[in-house]
Amino acid sequence: QLKILNRLVVQYEARLIEAEAADNIIRIVSLSLRIADTKAITMALSIDRGDDSAYLKYLQAGRMDETVLLDVTPAYALLKPAEIARISALPIRVKLQYLMRDPLERLWSNVRMLAKRSLNEGQDFLVNCQDILQRVFYTQEETHIVTRGDHRSNIARFVAVFDRSQFQVGFAESLQDGPKFDSMCAYWGINATSARQIKPAHVGVAAPFPEGLRRDTLQFLKTQYDFVADNFADLPENWRKNRELLA
């Protein structure tokens, strides 16, 4: 984790030099803030982790009268039971919401992100995506991708530690649904804004899913579709369409 953060600082600083050369004030300010924030979290995570006081201090930096602090990351899906228990023991009131994204779309998004990061000069982006995808379900490589999208196992680990008042499961697609988004905000204890005002962030490189691999990919993800269909009502439309292809 620290190595990744240090690499990010180097990347941001290189972009900052470019922004300064172009006299792009907005970009300069944005990158400067991002560099400062990344260095701050790196420092917090570098300190002895006997407790999490340094991280909590980082999380609350700049806090004034806000009643809720939100920490958003897909990395929580990788936590082991002991680490989840550690979260529950924090000296603050903790509530978690696990948002499930359509398994195929989530997998393809993760694959595209990795393909972009590992792309070599002259290499075709889509070919790199397909290579990663085939490694996932033909040779069982890139196991972290599977773990991140293993809704069944991830939910079970959190439910074993948190009760229903502290842990809620929903669909990522509900972020674009007014009433369901309002319900999410009520759970968090914050006022809801219009779902239409939500703008996608960290959008990956667009690339069409390789149709020749769709059937095998859906079959690979079948247990996830079945688990969610068996345990949650009102599947989003994109979930239903992909699941129907398995019939």
What is each stretch, according to the model?
Residues 32-39, 132-141, 205-212:
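Short glycine/proline-rich turn/loop motifs
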Residues 129-139, 227-236:
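Short flexible/disordered coil segments
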Residues 1-118, 141-179, 223, 230:
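PAPS-dependent sulfotransferase catalytic domain
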